[in-house]
Amino acid sequence: MKYYVVADPHGFYLYLRQALEEAGFFEDNEPHKLIVCGDVLDRGEESAEIVDFLLELASKDMLILVKGNHEDLFVQCLMDIAKGYVVDIASGCSYHYRNRTWHSILQLTKMKEKTAVDFSGSLVTKARNTRFYRELLPLCRDYYETDHYVFCHGWIPVINNGDKYSPIFEYDPDWRNADLTRWREARWYIGMQLACENGIKEPGKTIVCGHWHTSFGHNKYEGKGTYRGDADDLTPFYADGIIALDGCTVRSKRVNCIVIED
């Protein structure tokens, strides 16, 4: 099977489509699928368009959607709104505002911010009736695996023999059976760091991930460009056991796309 693989489109439908066009996705007459390694929304202004596009592919059995931390954040934001924190969120005092999850919810529900704050119960109801919540989120999986690759968002779950502030990570051979809490944590990991510094890899396979800007890996492990500077290299990062794809689309105006046959 041929897989076109992207990560972190973050609500930029046109950039995603452009990447797929350049890779030959739409002209490919052989069986193929799109793998999205998480974070569909929360940056761009084309939330509805990207959701409709992915669901169209899903209806043709052409989509594999891996859950990212921003998929978790969407659900958590609605829970926090329902608990009465809508004013804090809308006023910018919450990570839901800084992460742009609040803005994605407004886009999908087509509610004005003041109306959403004044009628937060209606906002939650409308958000839970969007195609993203009802149709796309249920398609998410923690990871996808082929003979030679594992596709995830941050990284695979690991064992932490330290604590939250001084972690000591090691490979967990039973990571596939990790519970929901550990998968949620794994979606926040920096895969490049775990692979290149901690040596945590899947034996015999390459892990393809997103979540963290690839300029981090290029700068820290290759000595190329900057990290969060004027000379960031945001192309895919390749190293032993890892391919990282998050191209920081909000800055680069591109979505990284690779093609894998396996």
Where are the model-predicted features located?
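A general structural motif
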Residues: 29-31, 60-62, 147, 202-205
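Short beta-strand-to-coil "C-cap" segments at the C-terminal boundary of structured domains/repeats
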Residues: 259-262
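Active-site neighborhood of phospho(di)ester-bond hydrolases with catalytic His/Asp-centered motifs
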Residues: 6-7, 34-38, 65-69, 152, ...
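Short glycine-/acidic-enriched loop or helix-start segments at secondary-structure transitions
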Residues: 16, 46, 75-77, 161-162, ...
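Active-site neighborhood of divalent metal-dependent phosphoester bond hydrolases
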Residues: 44, 48-51, 56-142, 147, ...
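Acidic, His/Gly-enriched loop-helix segments that form or flank divalent-metal centers
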Residues: 107-243, 249-253
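N-terminal active-site segment of His-dependent metallophosphoesterases
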Residues: 1-53, 58
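Short, glycine/acidic-enriched loop or turn micro-motifs at the edges of active sites
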Residues: 10-12, 42, 71-72, 156, ...
